């Protein structure tokens, strides 16, 4: 066990108390939703809120407004118990600046929200939510080779808007994730080995900073801020209102999906990892290893290895690469198909975890040694499982390396440049599940992550924020953290933009 008996008991009491409340929203485990904004909300009068409403081009939603409940919704519902006093639905960049100024004047805590997909609930607040989701617009400039995107655009909006132009900016696969958060935290996608991270394609961004000013950050204008905004994670330096990226042309690509069930799982995983490390940069895969959790009446289930991805080239190359893996064990299912990039994008689309969950991530350099493969598989088999979710224990390996390594770790705030894979594992549950079983699963994921620790490099992906991390600053930002603090102090000296894992103004 990673926690003491006393800690487990306190978790159990928290869970039992939440169950007694019979409210799904009031059921977070020991990282309470209320801690998403620890600053007490000052007593702002209705007149004060009306003042904000009158200054907006958009709309201010308050409790009782028919749109308020829908606007409150976030992906990580374990943090949904925190209810804001107001939600500013920004229509213009000026609205974002107005909200920042008003929050500073009134002392109201706030959070910035675009897609609402913060795994740790950092886009929620008990005060004001500055919501940029309605700021939607995509402008393609073929002559300049750039695309300018408003802050509320998500992956689905973006893909649909640029499809007629046959161009692309490296990005994620979840349709409802906002490009704002994706970019600010680095930005993984299936093409990262070929084109780099999303933040590596960023040319400039407009942002409402703590002073209430709207400024532009680029290599030639406010360069210190631009450095920090490429990997420093969202909500730390201001409210970004637009992003301009360099685009790349698209063409037909090769889509690949494969499944291996049972058999020599360790051998298959090892072969897949080794193949990817040495593969051309044009190949981008996500590999997962799953095992259906046991129940008292079930028999041990076989491991299932899934591979999904794209190759920016011909199918024959993919077949040759996968032949290395099929020498270990033939795939149960295999699909290799050349198709238009837009079709591949649709095939690759998937939602992120939703509801109540806990997620852990880390980076792998090279491949797992035999002991690491054993730990990987034995750990998955040890997961208790939660019946309500028909849970499968899962470990995923996202492609890394390639062009992501071509950028120096200190060239941008995104420090994770030496890895070959991003490792992720997660556990999901329902508020109706037995508290003891939920605790067992949460203890399991901490133990599993600790056991995998010797095979990870110590970093954690800042776009997969994790409130349980003790040394989050080093895990997210590594050697870049002191410079981020310096930039924070220059642009937000009063620490206006703050949340439990926000960049501070001093070390």
Language-model features: locations:
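Soluble FAD-dependent oxygen oxidases
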Residues: 2-507
